């Protein structure tokens, strides 16, 4: 769906956004007042690759050498290694499930939609603030809002489930959903997807616990309508869900930085080389 037209006409899946102010999704557009004759290569880089703290870098060096990562797809490694870092357990990645194209869908969604919906504030606070600011991504969690509490009482659902429902009402499909605490939030998300045509760009479902956790994760894994990242079993938690999003943001930022560097190198290579002039004796 066109990200501009959806604000002017009603489109299925974006009904809640009709009439809202438009948001530009172009990440490298120069202002009209810029010097259009100045090549992009001479302008300062906007994006720089993610630079971890030295202790964090050493941790990931140990993780990279701590097991054989060749069986795992290359595009999943950032997320999987961050999950090992979060859990302190190399076996944490063995039960992970990624639907086909989930990582690419998540990266594209973060860069285009720029909004993350979480079930609890602990997931929200686990997201790297510097990456959110660098990429211009907003987060929203309604679990403690009065409106969420009233909806929870009215419909007899948990506040986490009500927060997910309110997120669907507020943002429509333009959102990445990250659930790390409540199985009821996964249950509500899959219900909205199947019964109401909700199509979030990615659903991350990694709650921890013993009541309903296995079942809701398995139900999410079978929810073919949307890209999804989850696992099997009882392990998980808010730090896990936040780590997945952090991994996606790191890959998104590194991708932007690499693309920008490539474009600048191409611009420089395309510039005609200066031809020295020979002095002519008078």
Model-identified regions with their sequence ranges:
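Cysteine-cluster motifs in flexible loop/terminal segments that predominantly coordinate metals
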Residues: 2-8
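Electropositive, gly/pro-rich neighborhoods at or near active sites that engage anionic ligands
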Residues: 39-115
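C-terminal functional extensions of proteins
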Residues: 211-263, 275-282
């Amino acid at each position: 769906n066109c990200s501009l037209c959806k604000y002017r006409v009603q489109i299925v899946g974006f009904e809640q956004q009709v009439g809202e102010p438009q948001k530009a999704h172009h990440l490298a557009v120069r202002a009209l007042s810029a010097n259009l004759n100045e090549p992009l290569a001479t302008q300062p880089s906007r994006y720089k690759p993610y630079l971890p703290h030295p202790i964090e870098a050493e941790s990931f060096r140990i993780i990279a050498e701590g097991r054989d990562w060749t069986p795992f797809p290359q595009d999943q490694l950032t997320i999987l290694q961050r999950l090992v870092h979060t859990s302190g357990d190399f076996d944490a990645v063995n039960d992970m499930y990624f639907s086909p194209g989930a990582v690419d869908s998540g990266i594209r969604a973060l860069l285009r939609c720029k909004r993350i919906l979480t079930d609890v504030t602990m997931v929200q606070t686990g997201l790297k603030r510097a990456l959110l600011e660098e990429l211009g991504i907003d987060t929203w969690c309604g679990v403690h809002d009065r409106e969420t509490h009233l909806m929870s009482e009215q419909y007899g659902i948990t506040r986490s489930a009500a927060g997910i429902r309110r997120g669907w009402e507020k943002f429509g499909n333009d959102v990445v959903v990250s659930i790390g605490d409540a199985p009821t939030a996964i249950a509500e998300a899959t219900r909205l997807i199947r019964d109401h045509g909700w199509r979030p760009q990615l659903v991350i479902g990694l709650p921890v616990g013993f009541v309903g956790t296995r079942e809701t994760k398995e139900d999410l894994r079978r929810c073919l309508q949307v890209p999804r990242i989850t696992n099997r079993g009882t392990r998980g938690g808010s730090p896990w869900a936040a780590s997945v999003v952090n991994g996606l943001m790191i890959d998104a930022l590194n991708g932007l930085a690499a693309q920008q560097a490539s474009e600048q190198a191409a611009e420089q290579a395309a510039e005609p080389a200066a031809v020295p002039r020979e002095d002519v004796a008078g």
